[in-house]
From Swiss-Prot:
The keyword Zinc-finger does not apply. Pfam families: CstA. It comes from Helicobacter pylori (strain ATCC 700392 / 26695). It is a multi-pass membrane protein. It comes from the Bacteria. Its main location: membrane. Involved in peptide utilization. Belongs to the peptide transporter carbon starvation (CstA) (TC 2.A.114) family. The chain crosses the membrane at residues 6-26, 29-49, 87-107, 117-137, 162-182, 190-210, 221-241, 256-276, 285-305, 325-345, 373-393, 440-460, 462-482, 513-533, 546-566, 574-594, 642-662. It is found in: Cell inner membrane. One of its GO terms (biological process) is protein transport. This is Peptide transporter CstA.
Length: 687
């Protein structure tokens, strides 16, 4: 009887989710209540976790709690530590929930809310959550090894080396785009810059406090840090109101790029306890707390989505990012649905913390469910804005101009009527000098959050504080990711350099570490600076490259797991990773090809393609006589050439992994030939 009632309850959940999703898809009015989205997502995620993740865990992967995990076998109290699954879940979620799920859906909102909602809900349950879960499983069974090491073990030395180069390149692109989100949010914002600058001495104070005064008191020091952050936000308001102080803390995007490069270099070579660890503690508590409060606030306020279900920009003519709904929506949403970056975390610190194999279900699948919830919240923050305001914030200067009146006129001509006065009013409410062309997603999310708080409190004067609180919230954990990413990429560079000159691979060598860090910062710093001087705002051209590379990394990780499952003889079960891999790689190969096709009569494709842009720039260079304009064109030509070369390189790496994966799987299925042999660690019974 009880079993029947439970079954009926799940049937009800499924029907309710289908109805709510149907309403979102078929609604024809000007706006729709966000509660439909909240209920639909809750139902779909619940069903996905309860049934699909259970099927994967116990029918395909066959998780075994009697088998000792790497954390138990190699428990050293430092890197390998068996940890409660709730704590591991928090650590893993904090590590994967970077800028991607906030920025991608906000950019994709230019096409309307429906395409993003469908891809986030369906793609995450069947693809992204599976990806994180199965990569974590593979690493647990291989002594907590990294993605590159596992590819080397399961596919061969040569493939592993090439894949490691590709992974490093992708890592540098990821760090650059993360840093760019912060730069775009803080440019010309003395309030924002002052607040973020204050987080450095606050984090150092926390590090010293924990190191010398109150060791291991993480909660205590995080509360102190949070109080100091709130004080810094309030102080930032008065800095922005004082003309002299405001001028001191106001910077151009290009200047901020150099500052973040310097910060990234110094932070990554300092002891972890001094800056990185306290920032991590603070950003983790802040991240989980803000996301939890935002979910409750959205349910309480239930603001209407004002952005249309589908906009005219599905054809790729939109100003926010280049490309049509297929394939570029998929790579733009990126981390909100599936992210190759997560494979680096699922094969990094997390597998060294799991106390039981069954914990991988909650940590791997469950954390990605939470990340896709964050993506939906970001979409809500963009969707509740007046569409004209959304495009005023996210369109590059070259599309709408510098003047508010001109911007309002251009945006209104697109069919999203907005007045200059409405833009000025929002600018005043959030305490900024301008909101035009604040590309990168972070300002949009911050304004959306501030509006939700305003609807609760009913006082527009609170919007400025909450806007800057949201900017702080985003910048804090993005900078933490930049710190950690630079440090991780440094290790990858030293590992590769060690194959050429052994002393450079010595992780204990201070000089080798500094040299590798310089190479790393120069790598991601180039792309960051390129984005800050790009006339289209950087995000317009760089985010698609980030999306392509990130999704290709996810595809390679899924291919690795498919190879592992074929070697284990679980041919039918391997479809859980093989099918998403085929879909993701098909989308990314297609989008990658579109980014290197030559110039044509199709203006949308010309905007997408780096090669087409090179041809267009070359034509302009032939007719330009102004020396300054010519130098700008030459820089732009070179940047597009680098982007095109990287895109081709990433595709070749993914193609190599695909070909080798197909060969290994074919041999396993048709010839029962397992080579290279399965690299799973021997079974050790858990104590």
């Amino acid at each position: 009887m009880q079993k029947s009632l439970v079954s009926l309850a799940w049937v009800f959940v499924a029907i309710l989710g289908a109805i709510c999703l149907g309403v979102l898809a078929l609604h024809k009015g000007e706006s729709i209540n966000t509660l439909w989205l909240v209920v639909a997502s809750a139902c779909i995620y619940s069903i996905g976790y309860r049934f699909y993740s259970h099927f994967i865990a116990y029918k395909v992967l066959k998780l075994d709690d009697s088998r000792a995990t790497p954390a138990c076998v190699r428990n050293d109290g430092k890197d390998f530590v068996p940890t409660d699954k709730a704590i591991t879940f928090g650590h893993h979620f904090a590590a994967i929930a970077g800028a991607g799920p906030l920025v991608g859906p906000i950019l994709a909102a230019q096409m309307g809310y429906l395409p993003s909602i469908l891809w986030i809900l369906i793609g995450s349950v069947l693809g992204g959550c599976v990806h994180d879960f199965v990569v974590l499983f593979a690493s647990i069974r291989r002594d907590g090894k990294s993605l590159g090491e596992m590819i080397k073990l399961e596919m061969g030395q040569f493939v592993g080396m090439i894949a490691s180069l590709g992974i490093l390149g992708i890592m540098l692109i990821i760090i650059a785009i993360l840093a760019m989100v912060v730069v775009k949010a803080l440019a010309h914002s003395p309030w924002g810059f002052f607040t973020i600058a204050m987080t450095i001495p606050i984090a150092i104070l926390m590090g010293l406090y924990m190191r010398f005064f109150r060791p291991h008191k993480i909660l205590e020091v995080s509360v102190i840090g949070f109080i100091l952050l709130i004080i810094a936000i309030y102080a930032g308001k008065y800095v922005s109101l004082d003309p002299k102080l405001a001028s001191i803390f106001t910077f151009e995007a290009s200047s901020l790029a150099w500052m973040i490069m310097g910060y990234g270099f110094v932070a990554s070579i300092l002891p972890v306890w001094f800056l990185l660890a306290p920032r991590d503690y603070l950003s983790t508590f802040l991240k989980i707390g803000v996301i939890g409060v935002l979910v409750v606030a959205i349910i309480f306020v239930a603001p209407p989505l004002q952005i249309p279900k589908i906009t005219p920009f599905v054809d790729g003519s939109g100003p926010v990012f280049a490309g049509s709904v297929f394939p570029f929506l998929f790579i733009t949403v990126a981390c909100g649905t599936i992210s190759g970056f997560h494979a680096l975390i699922s094969s990094g610190t997390t597998p060294k913390m799991l106390a039981k194999e069954s914990d991988a279900r909650l940590v791997g699948y469950g954390s990605m469910v939470m990340e896709s919830v964050v993506a939906l919240m970001a979409l809500v923050c963009a969707g509740i804005l007046h569409p004209g305001l959304y495009f005023a914030i996210n369109s590059p200067e070259v599309s709408i101009g510098k003047d508010i009146a001109d911007a309002a006129s251009v945006i209104s001509s697109w069919g999203f009527n907005i007045s200059a006065e409405e833009i000025r009013e929002m600018t005043k409410n959030i305490g900024e000098s301008s909101i035009l062309s604040r590309t990168g997603g972070a300002p949009t999310f911050a304004i959306g959050l501030a509006m939700i708080v305003y609807h609760i409190l009913g006082d527009p004067s609170v919007m400025a504080f909450w806007y800057h609180f949201a900017i702080l919230f985003e910048a804090l954990f993005i900078l933490t990711a930049v710190d950690a990413g630079t440090r991780t990429a440094r290790f990858m560079i030293q590992d590769l350099l060690g194959n050429v000159y052994k002393p450079l691979g010595d992780l204990s060598s201070y000089k080798a570490g500094i040299f590798a860090t310089l190479l790393c910062v120069a790598g991601w710093g180039y792309f960051l600076y390129q984005g800050t001087i790009d006339p289209k705002g950087g995000i317009y051209t760089l985010w698609p490259l980030f999306g392509v590379s990130n999704q290709m990394l996810a595809g390679m990780a899924l291919l690795l797991v498919t190879v592992v499952l074929f070697k284990m003889g679980r041919f039918k079960g391997a479809m859980i990773s093989a099918l998403p891999a085929v879909l993701i790689l098909s989308i990314t190969f297609y989008s990658g090809i579109l980014k290197v096709v030559p110039k044509s009569d199709n203006s949308v494709l010309n905007n997408v393609s780096h090669v087409a842009q090179m041809q267009i720039i070359k034509e302009k260079m032939a007719t330009t006589t102004d020396e300054k304009a010519l130098k700008t064109l030459q820089k732009s030509f070179f940047n597009h050439a680098i982007d095109a070369i990287l895109c081709v390189f990433f595709m070749l790496v993914a193609l190599l992994v695909l070909i080798v994966s197909v060969r290994i799987c074919s041999n396993a299925y048709f010839k029962n030939k397992i080579y290279p042999p399965l690299a799973e660690t021997p079974y050790i019974k858990a104590s």
